From Swiss-Prot:
It holds the Pfam family Acetate_kinase. It comes from Thermoanaerobacterium thermosaccharolyticum (strain ATCC 7956 / DSM 571 / NCIMB 9385 / NCA 3814 / NCTC 13789 / WDCM 00135 / 2032). One of its GO terms (cellular component) is cytoplasm. This is Acetate kinase. Belongs to the acetokinase family. One of its GO terms (biological process) is acetyl-CoA biosynthetic process. Its main location: cytoplasm. It comes from the Bacteria. Its cofactor is Mg(2+); Mn(2+). The gene is ackA. GO terms for molecular function: acetate kinase activity; ATP binding; magnesium ion binding. The record marks 179, 240 as: Transition state stabilizer. Gene3D superfamilies: 3.30.420.40.
Length: 400
């Protein structure tokens, strides 16, 4: 089954055409600067990279251009659009409506629209992509795969905040969690690599990138995760503060004479390791500054980041009554051996020994703990697009 996987941002559109049977990526690309001057589509297929400069006034234009590229006689990979069996859409927020991926109907689209206030930066773009695809490919089944759905198995005592209960009933203020598709994929893949049933494992998945979150996955289900009502809660991140004392917001409003919105903007875009280091949100830059130039604030930023990850791993081991597997994934998790070692140092009491030679791995599946470790520590590159394609395939197959 050929599945087109679409991930729409406010001015961008990432896509992959995947053969779902074997996960083979037939083509992939990125449409940038949608609705802005100098729009560009970068299309990768058959080992070639094609750049197409053409104005895209909206997501519909972008999807038309993507489809044109896919069927192009020179650099396309399919003869015509009828070869696309289904479209899988990444949707950031499904609120409490969705516990799994779903076939997109008018009712589903309305529910996604109702979640806009929970994800004002992301859901509108996701909706644009869905509507555009429906207009261009009205007869092709479409599936929504939610970042939040995997975490809908959290128990109420894990997802409720200790604030007046009426705010939950009135406004649905609760922990939702994000990166669910990634946490689901790497936990399942880790179990496959170990050749053990996921239903028997306690897994801690660490998705560490510019946005970072950790999940406690017990018997294949998410029982807790570090991001919350929004992706601002939890770990220190590239530019996001993660969890802080809520009183800091009103304190900064008063001291700096700024609005709540301005403070939240600072916490989202000017904080995290960027805020502490004053240098960059890119961990490669921070490692260079800290280890090559001896920059104290860059070192401090890395310490704060690693400490919060370490603390969360420990707390999730407690929440699950132990741990069998710790998995690192995403940009930093997959490609940062030094950061991984830094995080794991002091956690040996959980039952693992790090193999420093194996830990040198970057961007590949590997078990990086020693053979005699009771707990397996692993690197598993995430593959959210493949997970979206597999979910889409499963739902479309069930319609037959």
């Amino acid at each position: 089954m050929k599945i087109l996987v679409i991930n729409c941002g406010s001015s961008s559109l990432k896509y992959q055409l995947i053969e779902s049977k074997d996960g083979n990526v037939l083509a992939k690309g990125l449409a940038e600067r949608i609705g802005i001057n100098d729009s560009l589509l970068t299309h990768n297929a058959n080992g070639e990279k094609i750049k197409i400069k053409k104005d895209m006034k909206d997501h519909k234009d972008a999807i038309k251009l993507v489809l044109d590229a896919l069927v192009n006689s020179d650099y396309g990979v399919i003869k015509d659009m009828s070869e696309i069996d289904a479209v899988g859409h990444r949707v950031v927020h499904g609120g409490e409506y969705f516990t799994s991926s779903v076939l997109i109907t008018d009712d589903v689209l309305k529910a996604i629209t109702d979640c806009i206030e929970l994800a004002p930066l992301h859901n509108p773009a996701n909706i644009e992509g869905i509507k555009a695809c429906k207009q261009i490919m009205p007869d092709v089944p479409m599936v929504a795969v939610f970042d939040t759905a995997f975490h809908q198995t959290m128990p109420d005592y894990a997802y409720l905040y200790p604030i007046p209960y009426e705010y939950y009933t009135k406004y649905k203020i609760r922990k939702y969690g994000f990166h669910g598709t990634s946490h689901k994929y790497v936990s399942q893949r880790a179990a496959e690599i170990l050749n053990k049933p996921i239903e028997s494992l306690k897994i801690i998945t660490c998705h560490l990138g510019n946005g970072s979150s950790i999940a406690a996955v017990k018997n294949g289900k998410s029982i807790d995760t570090s991001m919350g009502f929004t992706p601002l809660e939890g770990l220190a991140m590239g530019t996001r503060s993660g969890s802080i004392d809520p009183s800091i917001i009103s304190y900064l409003m008063e001291k700096e004479n700024i609005s709540a919105e301005e403070v939240v903007n600072i916490l989202n875009k000017k904080s995290g390791v960027y805020g502490i280091s004053g240098i960059s949100s890119d961990f490669r830059d921070l490692e260079d500054a800290a280890f090559k130039n001896g920059d104290k604030r860059a070192q401090l930023a890395l310490n704060v980041f690693a400490y919060r990850v370490k603390k969360t791993i420990g707390s999730y081991a407690a929440a699950m009554g132990g741990v069998d597997v710790i998995v690192f994934t995403a940009g930093i998790g997959e490609n940062g051996p030094e950061i991984r070692e830094f995080i794991l140092d002091g956690l040996e009491f959980l039952g693992f020994k790090l193999d420093k030679e194996k830990n040198k791995v970057r961007g590949e599946e590997a078990i990086i703990s020693t053979a005699d470790s009771k707990v397996n520590v692993m690197v598993v590159p995430t593959n959210e697009e493949y997970m979206i394609a597999k979910d889409t395939e499963k739902i479309v197959e069930s319609l037959k």
